Amino acid sequence: MPVNEYGQMIGESMEGYTSGELPAIDFLEGRYARIEALSVEKHAEDLLAVYGPDTPREMWTYLFQESVADMEELVTVLNQMLSRKDRFYYAIVDKATGKALGTFSLMRIDQNNRVIEVGAVTFSPELRGTRIGTEAQYLLARYVFEELNYRRYEWKCDALNLPSRRAAERLGFVYEGTFRQAVVYKGRTRDTDWLSMIDKDWPQVKARLEAWLAPENFYKDGRQHKSLREF
């Protein structure tokens, strides 16, 4: 730990440090998943099954968004999402079918400190618990650390949303604490769990994710040999 001229411990020097760039993703492609910049024209038809009236009601409990009634409302919602200048939205596409199965966003971007959050994660039931969903998260994290060269990658969720927190920890995010009464939404109070991954974590996290995603870790029917937590 560095020590200054007064004998005080201080953080590591960041000599030559510069601020970060904003995301500029057209697409990212893996074995199973393809991330594409969200497009109403390209993705709305598929995303009606993700955001529409037939989705499970419990899917929306911890999301700021609610399900939509029809295509007209979905188009309005997607256009509102795309109009935001502080967030970058992406569709998660199954490479095997070309179908969009979910969306997520890079948001709360602090360029000066190279901090960014993955949020607004909206996965269809079809996407949850799949290689496609895990690989999509891997591709986005790899972009954050290896292309944008950001230092800190965040995940936040309602403290009562245990599936979200478990998903984050499975991917390699580390729980840091709970911000009490941080948000009011849907007419109720919310404590918010904060989790993060930093650049020093990424090499080990990357190795685990790549080992789990490798074809040899799966049977022909798609079942895994080893869970991600076993790596």
Predicted feature descriptions by range:
Residues 155-164:
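Conserved beta-strand-loop-alpha-helix junction that forms the acyl-donor binding cleft
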Residues 133:
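Glycine-rich acyl-CoA binding loop
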Residues 140:
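Flexible ATP-lid and adjacent glycine-rich G1/G2 motifs of the Bergerat
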Residues 174-188:
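Conserved catalytic-core motifs of GNAT/GCN5-like acyltransferases
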